[in-house]
Amino acid sequence: MAYDPKGLTASEVTQLANAIDTWLDAVNNSLFGSLGWFVGHPYTLSFLTRYMHSMGNQTLSYDVIANEAAIRFANDRAVAAIKAGAGCYFDRVQKGGWENDDFETSLGAVGISYKVADQSAKGFYVKATIDDWYDFHAQATVEFPYLDYFACDWKGGNIIYDKWMDQLAEAGFAQRFRTHIEWTLFVPYTLE
């Protein structure tokens, strides 16, 4: 793939949007088990890995994306957390650190919240929101495209990537990289 130094090409933006759509569709339309590994994930991972690699491999983001075992580990932990908290409300949990062997901490700061949106005698909805902030090392020498804002609409208006880059220095270095992913899952469950 060829990369424009001023930003993603139209076809690349479309490819990324489609990959994310496929990825989230697989999550939204499935139950607990599919969170561990789903059809759209390899395609999304492959595209993001190629994109980050084209810009250099000195960022934590690339390390995380390239570490499929860490991603699977994180998904398994998310599944366990949802199952353990069925019917409960969890306050936001903050994780810190730069340990690449743990996906939750390798992002630097991860906030996860689970909330029961609606429940009845037959079941309830669990809404899980994950906000990830990627704060790059100040000494990073990786150049990123001049892309001030990138938004992907999924199913009638949900913003999946609110900002691809929050701030850009004049030289093209990313100061902050933010992603927002929101999952709404239906969990079949009979209340006692």
Summary of predicted features, one role per range:
Residues 1-116, 120:
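Glycine-rich short-loop/terminal segments
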Residues 94-152:
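Acidic, glycine-rich flexible loop segments
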Residues 132-192:
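Active-site or metal-binding loop neighborhoods of secreted/extracellular toxin and effector enzymes
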